[in-house]
Regions:
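A transmembrane-helix-recognition feature enriched in membrane-embedded lipid enzymes
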Residues: 3-66, 118-122
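Soluble catalytic domains of membrane acyltransferases
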Residues: 60-160
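Juxtamembrane, membrane-proximal amphipathic segments and lipid-exposed surfaces
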Residues: 1-2, 84
Length: 160
């Protein structure tokens, strides 16, 4: 009985997370559409996600994170942020942690998600984990984005 209850709560938690994520995207839709139109406008896209989307989802889920950095991020510097990925909340936390725009590296399968996939395809560095050429191309695209002054956010052990 406990296992059934756990599955029910987990399922409801996921539904609520995706509901909040989609509502946030729909609310910001015109701005996200505009700022995802050109690569050079990505910092504004990131700012929207950092300032509105991530806090909306985090607070809506009942999370009130406190971030303590051993050293603050220097404004205008590029960083490569690497973390384990065990929950969809990890993405929101990555947006939350830094004000410096970072481009996410992620699996190409997420392009298929309704609404989210449209923006994901336009602003992220996608990788086909089964294709060695795709995995190598990620380095070139990441290097280009770093040269543009953007950071890179990656979850190399993603299990979500």
């Amino acid at each position: 009985m406990q296992k059934a209850w756990d599955y029910l709560v987990y399922g409801l938690w996921n539904v609520w997370f995706y509901f909040l994520s989609i509502v946030g995207i729909l609310f910001l839709f015109p701005f996200l559409l505009l700022f995802s139109a050109y690569e050079k406008w990505y910092p504004q896209f990131f700012w929207l996600a950092h300032t509105f989307w991530a806090p909306f989802v985090m607070y809506g889920m009942g999370f009130f994170p406190s971030v303590r950095l051993s050293e603050p991020f220097e404004k205008g510097k590029s960083y490569v942020l690497v973390a384990n990925h065990t929950s969809m909340i990890d993405i929101m936390l990555m947006f939350w942690v830094t004000k410096n725009p970072g481009v996410f590296v992620g699996k190409k399968e997420l392009v298929k998600l309704p609404i989210f996939g449209y923006f994901y395809k336009r602003v992220c560095i996608m990788v086909d984990r089964q294709n060695i050429k795709s995995r190598k191309a990620v380095y070139d695209r990441a290097e280009k984005r770093l040269r543009q002054g953007l950071g890179i956010c990656i979850f190399p052990e993603g299990l979500v």
